[in-house]
Amino acid sequence: MTESLIMNNISKYNISPQFNSDRIYNDPSLMDDEFSDNEYDLSPKDDVPSPSKRGRGQIQNGIRRSPNKWTEEEDQKLFQLVSIYGEKKWKRISAEMGGQKTGAQCAQHWKRVLSPDIRKGPWDEDEEELLLRLVNQHGSSWKKIAKRICKRTDIQCRYQYLKSLQSREVAWVPKEDEVLVKKVDEMGENLSWLEVSEYLAKLKHTNTLRTALECKTRYLQLTGKGGSILPPLNQSNVSSLNSSSANTFNQQLQYQQQQQQQQQQQQQQQQQQQQQMNNNYNNNYNNNNNNINNNYNNNHNNQNNNNNNNHNHYNNHYNQMNNNNNNNHYNNNNNNNNNINNNNNNNMYQMNNNNSNSNNNNKSHNLSPLSSIIDSNTSSPSFEGCEDNNNNNNNNNNNNNNNNNNNNNNNNSNNTPPNIFRPLPHKPVVTGLTSPTSSPIPSSPPLTPPTSLTLPSSTLSSPSCNNSIRQPSPSPSIKTFKSTIVSTPSRPSPSSSTNSAFSINNIIDSENNNNNNNNDNDNIKVEDNGCNEPVMKKVRSNGEFYYQPIKNKLNNNNNNNNNNNNNNNNNNNNNNNNNNNNGNNTLSYNSDNSSDDDMLPKLKNNKQILSNFKNHNNNQSNTSPMSSPISSPHQSSIEKLKATSFDFFKLESLATLASQSQIVNELVN
């Protein structure tokens, strides 16, 4: 075994110089007292025994005393009992011993001292080398080491290792080297390193015991590891050997230190490399994570932007579609409204023309009283006031023509239907109808006094001639209304007969009188306060007559309000026309408490009315008399006339009179 293996061991055990291995292994009393199992395991060992520090002893009179040493008699008796009972029944052996020794003490003393398997004496170089190897492997586990080393106890192994450490700590002196070399040369072939160790211990050149392995190692160092025999040593050689041995030892120490430093440097380098690798790994990991996060965020933002763009495009497209639909819907609604307004205006215009034509037809044949006859349930009318009715019908005809022209102009300018105000209709009550051939039946007087449409004096006397209509007041008869408001020239009847109230000549004369008035009777005039302007006129709309007031030329308004004014006045004229056709020449007026100011819209200009009226007359004059609606009555009217009980009237003569061109020209003029 080399010196380096010995020097690497831990040198923490200090052994006194008085330690003598020969005395330990050869004196059995020391083995029993100082190095027995009892001293090692149970209690400490002192040189001076005392009852307070000793272990268990004999019990005498109830008091334990200090144990005695193992005597030769006790050793022989223990040897005999173990041979009889074996190495397992230690309690029984202790009882056989007389109770002075316990079973544990008997077992330890047998295994460590008296057992024939235990090898006693010093350790040779081979056992010591094996011990050092086992200590390097197992450390301080002495029981394990003792099992590997045959015939040696754990205590022997421990003390031998401590002795070898102590001998290596003390340096060799030159005298020891001379005795070592000399003794080896003397022994020659019968060389035993154990005997050399014992010989050096007897000389006592030093206070340290040299083991057999240490003597062998020192001799190999002195001889140069070749085993050659050196020349005889003197003092100078011994000093040189000492210096050389010290140098070799120092070199070994330096070598070991260098190796340790190199190992430390390598460890430091490895640690640095490991740290760099860890840092690189962490940096790479962080960079990868950052790149991944950035890529993900960029992709997510791009997707959001694309989605927003798509959503905006969709919204724009949707808004465009909605705008197109709204525009189309608005255009369609406007077109439909325009079409409806045009159709309504055309229908109203046609109805107004038809109504005016039917009125002209009735007026040309002096059939104005027959309109009330057709709608009445009685047999014959009274012929009183026919002249007044003819005049009113002529006025209504002219007013309707003017209103039709105005409506046509307004419809061309504005495509909106007129707002016609229609008051509650005043139905006339026709009474006292008699047949010309039969005797007249007197009619019963009315239960209520008749009413007529008059104008208040406040409106007639206004200097601005606004001609507004107020609430009508009752009058005794239609003649009073005629004398106060309407100024018409009266002509005497050309023919006289018993029945002068109704005749064809009277009808013709009355019609001629109406035509000679220069169409002044179409409008109601007011003669008070020097204002000769027309006050109102008759207008027919949808089969009903209304009174329409006419403004002065100075009070001109927009044409957009003419349609409403005409329609409101048509309702009034319808009531007046029906009241004029009453058999008793009276008007049945349903009075109410409301004012007529709400029924009076803005009036129209007289110049425009006259121009429209002239145009209408010119258009009528261009048509042939036979083809005009005035030339022949309607079939329905003829059937109604035939169904009544009027046997005094011949329709053929009436058609003949209507076909005369002279009468038609007079009506047109």
UniProtKB/Swiss-Prot annotation:
SUPFAM superfamilies recorded: Homeodomain-like
DNA-binding region, residue intervals: 90-114, 142-166
Acidic residues bias locations: 30-40
GO CC aspect terms: nucleus
Comp. bias regions, Polar residues: 465-482
Localization (cell): Nucleus
Domain of life per record: Eukaryota
GO MF terms, alphabetically ordered: DNA binding
Region described as Disordered: spans on this chain: 27-69, 226-530, 550-636
HTH myb-type domain ranges (all copies): 60-118, 119-170
Gene3D superfamilies referenced in this protein's UniProt entry, alphabetically: Homeodomain-like (1.10.10.60)
Low complexity: compositionally biased ranges: 234-382, 389-415, 450-464, 483-521, 555-593, 611-636
The name this protein goes by in its record: Myb-like protein M
Source organism (scientific name): Dictyostelium discoideum (Social amoeba)
Lineage: Eukaryota, Amoebozoa, Evosea, Eumycetozoa, Dictyostelia
